[in-house]
Amino acid sequence: MSFISVLRLPIALFLFAIGLTHAYAQGESASIIQVKLLRESSIMAPVAGEVINVGSLNKNVELMVYPLNDDYYEFTFGNGRGLIDKDDLEPVQKSKKVLGLELADLQKLNQNLITTRTTVLYNHPKAKSGVFGELSENLRYPILGRLKGDDGVLWYEINVGDDVKYVRADDCELDNGIPVLTYHHVLKDDENRLFRNTSTTTSDTAFDAQMGYLKSAGYRTLSLAQLEGYLNNSVNLPAKAVVLTFDDGLKSVYRYAYPILKKYGQQATAFIISSRVKHNPQPWDANSLQFMSISEIKQIQDVFDIQSHTHFLHRYSDDKRPVLLSRTEHNIQLDFERSARVLKPFNPKVLYVSYPFGGYNDKAIEAARLAGYRLAVTTVRGKVKPGDNPYTLKRLYVLRTDSIDAMAERIANNRSDVKPMAVRQ
């Protein structure tokens, strides 16, 4: 959540957004109350750290809520909690139907639905079922199961307020994962003489256009901590979400990428080769690969999260393969740990690593885990999905020569390679 967003929130909603709520603090011992809505009510929830409107619930529907404060109750919503105005509710005696009974038979499937428009929530998997409420567009929501109704319509089962509700499959999309974009070097076209045919070098104008597209299309740039929460099914995120990563820690990132990201209000991760951090800034030279200095890394930290690209392992061995692949697990672990120590003045929580040149093996995976890293990214192409191995995460490239339409197609949720789910009849 940005500082500006925090200023706009009452203190109760700010505490709610960061998870410091009464029910969470009390855990399972928190009192749970069954309530009925006196009128249609808007609902809010933290999505990527910002409390936003996420839908509405209809008059007379019932749900289970937890005490929060004098103004709000909270309730189960997706991978977290939602928020509803106390004035819109009244406690009721437990109805003949015990809410939450069906949930015991259902578990999260490591699959989400995506709302591309306002999406109706039904009480039962029937076309003429009563309507419980609506979900707003641009949400990811965990699916508990799917089934076919008597009329052959496919339905998704989800948990709202500790009860099973139903969404028609043709009212939403299946989540195909979050794109993690990879960048390295940024130059102006008129100064790029040596790296024009290098796929890892983009132009400042192309990068500006790409970041402008993300902004205008409504994409939210995520931190790796939020991506970790997505993998663990512990956070609510928008449907339009992307992670931006920069490998190496080149000076061109400070010179060109940083001001562009700042202009569009984006955040990104810089994977730094810790042994190449300079003590003092170097005079700019577009014809060489220069690395950021201590002061330059500090300046970009309002936009960039500083993470590891190893210490001495970013090089090739004599056989032209990443040197990491020829090292023992112990030596890899020592390098990973050293990199985290060197980067600690910039970030006390160096928890994520990018394998040099995308090269990794079982030894590198285990070394990353033992060194205390919680995610590791590769250069294998694809999106990140719940259930993926956190130490072999895929990424995508957007090239200098790619059109904005090509980029939009690459990051959109429009592919069909999602894992099939069992259907209950």
Predicted ranges, named:
Residues 43-46, 74, 122-124, 188-193, ...:
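Short, solvent-exposed loop/turn elements at domain surfaces
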Residues 116, 150, 163-241, 402, ...:
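N-terminal pre-catalytic segment of deacetylase/amide-hydrolase enzymes
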Residues 176-201, 239-242, 256, 262-361, ...:
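Metal-dependent polysaccharide deacetylase catalytic core of the NodB/CE4 family, i.e.
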Residues 26-31, 76-108, 157-186:
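Boundary regions of SH3-family modules and the immediately adjacent low-complexity/disordered segments
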Residues 53-86, 134-169:
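SH3/SH3-like beta-barrel superfamily modules
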Residues 10-19:
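Bacterial N-terminal signal peptides
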Residues 1-10:
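Bacterial N-terminal signal peptides that target proteins for export
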